[in-house]
């Protein structure tokens, strides 16, 4: 019999979150970002909930091909572009749109033998300093791309570094406007945070990622209260044992937790080999039988332990929610010093996942 740990992907939540993005950016088309196997949710599992999008954004050619095999005939954007000339053959065969951020990529595209022009999103580096042409070099890149026989429609794009923070987006928008001055074409600037909080950046296409999965771009649950976003993943397990401790008794490796009095603890079938963060400290929230309580002791490879004081009726078989519809993933991530993105992507292959 399998362990009681499993993840559930909520198709209705995905559809709801896409609708939320449309409500925030009603005049823009949407690239629903499904990179990293849909942020750990599974590309095939999220497709039914997100198929009302205008396009999908991802990184891997294999995932792009999989989307085509699932029946998606609309636009697919390769957010990092391509890496070698043979990639362009796949782009051509499957009618993909690609980001283009360097002279090396442009040179490969100029030399490619294509059956039809490739639509590109020409990327400007407005301050993130990862990919793209600087504003000063952008026009020359655009003119070269426009002259290339293998290039079709050109959309202008950039990516924000601080749309969820205090610095905001104004300095990058100004850089973008400077570099794109006088250049015609659709624009794509807004990520999840900008989709929610910076409407002036919406333009023609927005690129929501984390909000498709119901989590906060800032990593703070309160920041998305009132948006209508819903968690798209629930990670749940059960208590597989209950121990009663006396004062001074310890729990787990390193004896890091010591009982201050008589108490019951529950042992949960979930550990760091399942993707739960080993660094989760005492106090990390968890839900047992619908009641919020806390992790105590170190997280082990296959198990973790929780305080049952607030849940006196809990016993073996009691349901445990590690994160999901009753416990925002950002609350868990914040306690662990990380972000919900990482927890989503870290769910291990050995965890059974189903969509509903």
Swiss-Prot record:
EC numbers, comma separated: 5.1.1.1
UniProt keyword annotations, A-Z: Isomerase, Pyridoxal phosphate
Top-level taxonomic group: Bacteria
SUPFAM superfamilies in alphabetical order: Alanine racemase C-terminal domain-like, PLP-binding barrel
GO biological process, one term: D-alanine biosynthetic process
Pathways involved: Amino-acid biosynthesis; D-alanine biosynthesis; D-alanine from L-alanine: step 1/1
Residues with the N6-(pyridoxal phosphate)lysine modification: 35
Gene Ontology cellular-component annotations: cytosol
Active site: 35 (proton acceptor), 253 (proton acceptor)
Annotated GO MF terms: alanine racemase activity; pyridoxal phosphate binding
CDD domains named among the record's database cross-references: PLPDE_III_AR_proteobact
Cofactor(s) the record lists: pyridoxal 5'-phosphate
Full protein name: Alanine racemase
Species per Swiss-Prot/TrEMBL record: Paraburkholderia phytofirmans (strain DSM 17436 / LMG 22146 / PsJN) (Burkholderia phytofirmans)
Upper lineage: Bacteria, Pseudomonadati, Pseudomonadota, Betaproteobacteria, Burkholderiales
Gene it is expressed from: alr
